[in-house]
C-alpha cells in the first residue's frame, strides 16, 4: 500500500512540473511573437516615412519612444535633423498645426455634413424644376386655342392659294345667306303674282273689245265669246309678264284703264250684221261698270 501511494504522489508531481514547463514555454513563445511583430511594424513605419519623403519631397521625421519613456530610435538616424524638425513644428501656430494634422473622426463628420448639404441642394433644385415645368404646362394650355386658330387660318390661306378658283370665304357666306333668304323672297313674289293675276282677271271681266273704223268713225263690238277668249289669253300673257316683272323688280303690276292703237287698219261697216265677218281694224278696250 505504501509503495503504491508513493508512486501516485510521484506521478502527480511530475504532471505538475510538466504543466508548469508548458506554461513557461508558451509565454516565452508569445513574447517572441510580439517582439517580432513589433519589429516588423517598426520597419514598415520607417519604410513608409522614407517613401513619403521621397515621393512628396517633404521633411518627415519619426521619433520612437518605449514604454518607460526612453528614446529608442529615430528616423532619420541623424538626431540633429530630427530635433530641428521637431522645434520648427512646435513653433507653429495652432491653426497651422491643424492644417498639417488629420483627424479621422472630424474628417468623417465633415464628409457626412457635406453629403447632407449636397442632397438638400439636389432636392431644392428638383423642386424648382418641377415648379417651372408646371408653369410651362399652364402656359401651353393657355396658348393651345391661339395655336389652333393660327393653324386654321394658315390652312385656309394655303387652300385658297392652292385653289385660286375657289371663292373667298366672304362670298361663300353671302351665298349661304342668299340661299336661306331665296325661299322667303320666292314666297313673297309668288304671293304678289297671285294677287296681280286675280286683280287682272277681275278688271278684265269689266272690259269689252271694240273695233274702231277711222273712215266713218264707227265702232264694232266683238262678241262675248271672242272677248272672253281674248280676255283669258291676255290674262295669261299679262300674268306671265306680271310674274316676270314681280320676280325681277318685286313690284306690283299696274295695268292702264284704256288701250288703243295709232295705226289704222282696213275699214268696216258699222251697220253690218253680227254674223258677218268683220274687217281688221283697230281693237280698242273700254272699261264699263
UniProtKB/Swiss-Prot annotation:
Pfam families: SRF-TF. Keywords: DNA-binding, Nucleus, Transcription, Transcription regulation. One of its GO terms (biological process) is positive regulation of transcription by RNA polymerase II. GO terms for cellular component: nucleus. Residues 18-78 form the MADS-box domain. Residues 151-197 are annotated as: Disordered. GO terms for molecular function: cis-regulatory region sequence-specific DNA binding; DNA-binding transcription factor activity; DNA-binding transcription factor activity, RNA polymerase II-specific; protein dimerization activity. This is Agamous-like MADS-box protein AGL93. Expressed in pollen. The keyword Transcription applies. Probable transcription factor. Residues 187-197 have a biased composition (Polar residues). It is found in: Nucleus. The gene is AGL93. CDD domains: MADS_SRF_like (cd00266).
